[in-house]
Amino acid sequence: MSILVKMPLNLAFLNFNAANKIKKNFPDVKNWYIGGHSNGGQFAAVHVSKYYKDYKGLILLASISSFKDLSKIDIKALSIIGSEDGIVKMDIYKRYKKNLPKDLTEYIIPGGCHSYFGMYGLQKKDGTSNITNVEQIEFAADKISEFIN
């Protein structure tokens, strides 16, 4: 089961603890993962910094953990970013990678960009992708499935 949470104004920081309510609505679910794309991933990381014992893993898509240092938290993490991401540039990603949990699985999608983790069109200032939107989503979905299973 996957649950997508609609954020107010599409901004995760306006409701980054929404997962607590969702977990209460599904008490039979024992293995929770949390994640997000871009700022959604950043605020999933903020949430995990406080509630890490509630989760099996953290999934970051074109995202960083610049607000919280998760390196000492006992949780596994998956980070996927495109090599052509123009929003979370590689130097920024590498600078904040040290904040991610030690149990980190990382993939850099050759030719992938920031916008292609979704189907919302291209963001201003994003890089030029060398793969299709569908190829990037399929790559990410496969890696997430492997990570969870």
Positions of predicted regions on the chain:
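C-terminal catalytic-base region of ester-bond hydrolases, centering on the histidine
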Residues: 96-149
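A conserved short beta-strand
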Residues: 53-65, 76
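Short beta-strand/loop motif that positions the catalytic acidic residue
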Residues: 73, 79-81
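Short alpha-helix in the alpha/beta-hydrolase fold that links the catalytic acid
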Residues: 88-98
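Acidic catalytic loop of the alpha/beta-hydrolase fold
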Residues: 84-88, 114-115
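Conserved alpha/beta-hydrolase "nucleophile elbow" surrounding the catalytic nucleophile
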Residues: 32-41, 82
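Alpha/beta-hydrolase active-site loop
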Residues: 8-29, 34, 46
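Short glycine-enriched nucleophile-adjacent loop
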Residues: 41-52
